[in-house]
A protein has these predicted regions:
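Basic/polar N-terminal segments that are highly enriched at the extreme N-terminus
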Residues: 1-7, 701-703
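Active-site core of metal-dependent hydrolases
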Residues: 10-125
Length: 703
């Protein structure tokens, strides 16, 4: 029998929680820290010194030797620089371990080597990290030792945001301020803030590490750039929610333990649709903590997979022909006195506050559909969105039958008199209970779906930080709340004004509501008639960051300056170009050094066989036909490889980042597809024993 695991005991054991602060800090200091966490404010240096000492003592007791300001630059992953707690030895030669309040609050990493989109020159190296007091410090432990990690924001010497956390925190304050205006209108005077909560469902693939190391494309690009489909894929629908293999289950068990220690509320785990694909979902938490924890989830997945002889693939589309991976971003708003603004109750037609919030969100999503799409755009996501496995690239909102009916009543008559109820689900079996049925079904094809008391934004890519989608969501909803509050706060008769405004918003923005099949061609045509944007690539999406509408939105709430937005647009173009360039160079390398030589060797064997059969006086028609077919495909692959190299050479003459990104999308990417096609066809024709890399069957079924 395996050892009994005490989850309550290990949960948060590597986190400097409020509970540990309460135990270790003087009462007055703890109260000051708690007040700042709850309501904002600046920590005095004297208080920071006390907190730093308590934090250091706790970390050292748990084996830590170093600390780091843990931040999230515009690379999309985390960054850290480790500093030891050591100082100069005293007169007796004894080492003194210190950590000051100043070191806790502020760090100075080199800002010149991170993406800045022109905000910083190479010689302008100074950058600052600032402690995010609302996200608890934690310990990371691996073969390098134990490190105290302090979540921080990252900005330039001039104050520009150089990370993903700073805009997120700004957006959280913006939506809280504007949402408070809304709840005040309905008589809630107790709430002091409105909190954006997030729960990201993380999808991923696991492959055997030995096989992974034999694929250059997986190593350099994170996805397979070549690969014929295996005879069996996901068509039997037998992997989704299927029995978890013991090797995978062992990985999941260790992953859960590591995450629980880090305070991550890992709750749900299961097999996903594609072979070798799985999912982990946590419980919801405050948006910035959810962002931090999701970064820890992705990092921990990779580490734990390595211990089990596997590699975790987080790319949105590691294998062609089977489902890719996403990260469903469940988002909601709640007051600090326990009111979920997205809870419609049993009779949403009577819940005027909910209807106003819903109308504002529909207005926000419709007005800024392009910007919301951009927030989830990514090089890898281009391969996933719009296929019959993921939400379409067209933003629409699924409300379900109950809310759609309420909206219809309000638009047509200005009044909603009833709400469809769920009723009972009769199982028809005497030993099974009859079940309370929800008032609406779910729609897995919708990119932005209402799911009972939250919205699920399903376009986000599996490898992406969830900071940008939530920054954008918070910002666009803050704007809609602000405009509504501006009108209603001046109204002579609030009841009449709020009903009129709800009807106005729903009427003007009902085009964004779609409860049907988002995968269908009919929806693509219908969306075009409705005037909804259909942004199909990261390059096209990047342009939306710097439209007049977007700049006005972000500047109004102090989330981004125009300079910060333009820098991010440039970084996105550069990231796209660099990513496709790496993929293209990898394809060239694999084609020239692996595939073409292997096939040439095989054709030599076939040619020898043809000669041997003919010399024996036998019929060599079959051998000759096979040799001819393979030789023709080999020539096609060789020509495509040469063409791809030629296209890559042309990029050297394109200096404009935007034009270069479009060239990679329209020209280089097409040349990559042209090379993949004959190589994949050759894989189906050549003896498996001589094929130079593990196949799809090897990778996704042998793990």
């Amino acid at each position: 029998m395996s050892e009994v695991l005490n989850v309550e005991e290990i949960f948060g054991s590597k986190v400097f929680t409020l509970g540990k602060m309460r135990e270790r800090l003087p009462k007055s200091i703890y109260k000051e820290v708690k007040k700042i966490i709850d309501h904002g404010g600046e920590l005095s240096l004297a208080t920071a010194d006390v907190v730093a000492k308590a934090m250091k003592d706790w970390a050292i007791e748990n084996g830590a030797t170093h600390y780091t300001h843990w931040f999230q630059p515009l690379t999309g992953i985390t960054a850290e620089k480790h500093d030891a707690f050591v100082t100069h030895p005293d007169e007796s030669g004894k080492m003194i371990m210190e950590f000051s309040g100043k070191e806790l609050i502020k760090g100075e990493p080199d800002a010149s080597s991170f993406p800045s989109g022109g905000l910083r020159a190479t010689f302008e190296a100074r950058g600052y990290t600032a402690w995010d007091i609302t996200s608890p410090a934690f310990l990371k432990e691996d073969a390098t030792g134990v490190i105290l990690c302090i979540p921080t924001a990252f900005c330039s010497y001039k104050g520009e945001a150089l990370d993903k956390k700073t805009p997120l925190l700004r957006s959280m304050e913006a939506v809280s301020t504007q949402a408070l205006r809304i709840v005040r209108l309905f008589g809630n005077t107790e709430a002091t803030k409105v909190v954006a909560s997030v729960g990201p469902e993380q999808e991923y693939f696991l492959v055997d590490r030995d096989k992974y190391l034999k694929r250059e494309d997986l190593i350099f690009a994170g996805r397979t750039l070549f690969g014929a489909p295996a005879p069996k894929g996901q068509e039997l629908e037998d992997h989704y929610f299927g029995t978890i293999r013991e090797r995978i289950g062992s990985f999941m068990k260790d992953l859960n333990i590591e995450l629980w220690k880090l305070g991550v509320t890992a709750k749900t785990q299961h097999n996903e649709v594609a072979p070798a694909q799985h999912e982990l979902a946590p419980i919801y938490e405050t948006a910035n903590i959810a962002v931090d924890h999701n970064q820890l989830v992705m990092e921990t997945m990779k580490k734990v997979a390595g211990r089990h002889g596997m590699t975790c693939l987080l790319h949105e589309k590691p294998f062609a022909g089977v489902n890719g991976s996403g990260k469903h971003n469940n988002w909601s708003l709640g007051t600090d006195n326990g009111v979920n603004l997205l809870d419609p109750g049993d009779t949403p037609n009577e819940n005027i506050q909910f209807l106003l919030v819903l109308a504002c969100i529909l207005k926000a999503v419709d007005t800024h559909a392009d910007l919301l799409s951009q927030s989830a755009s990514d090089v890898g996501n281009d391969h996933r969105l719009g296929a019959n496995e993921a939400p379409p690239a067209i933003i629409s909102v699924f409300l379900g039958e109950q809310l759609e009916d309420v909206v219809k009543q309000l638009v047509e008559t200005g009044d909603a008199t009833h709400s469809i109820q769920g009723g009972k689900l009769l199982t028809g079996v005497s030993t099974l209970p009859d079940l309370d049925k929800d008032a609406t079904d779910r729609n897995r094809t919708s990119p932005f779906a209402f799911t009972g008391n939250k919205f699920e934004f399903r376009m986000v890519g599996s490898a992406d930080s969830i900071a940008s989608p939530n920054t954008t969501l918070n910002a666009i909803v803050a704007e809609a709340f602000c405009e509504a509050a501006d009108i209603l706060e001046k109204a002579d008769d609030f009841d009449i004004a709020v009903h009129d405004l709800i009807k106005k918003y729903l009427t003007e923005h009902q085009r964004i509501i779609f409860n049907g099949n988002g995968y269908s061609e009919e929806w693509v045509e219908e969306a075009a008639k409705r005037g909804l944007p259909n942004i199909k690539s990261m390059v096209e999406a990047s342009e939306t960051l710097t439209t007049e509408k977007s700049i006005k939105l972000f500047e109004k709430f102090g989330i981004f300056t125009e300079a910060e937005l333009r820098s991010r647009e440039e970084i996105l173009y550069e990231t796209y170009s660099k990513t496709i360039n790496i993929e293209a160079l990898t394809m060239v390398d694999m084609a020239k050094k692996q595939y073409i030589p292997a096939v040439m060797e095989y054709t030599k064997t076939l040619a020898d066989t043809v000669l041997a059969v003919k010399s024996a006086g036998a019929d060599a028609t079959v051998q000759t036909t096979v040799l001819k077919s393979i030789s023709e495909k080999l020539a096609e692959a060789q020509a495509a490889e040469t063409s791809l190299e030629d296209k890559l050479a042309e990029t050297a003459g394109i200096e404009n980042p935007k034009k270069l990104a479009f060239f990679y999308k329209d020209v280089v990417h097409t040349a990559m597809d042209d090379l993949r096609t004959p190589v994949d066809e050759l894989e189906m024709m050549v003896d498996k024993k001589v094929w130079p890399v593990p196949t799809y069957g090897d990778l996704i079924f042998e793990v």
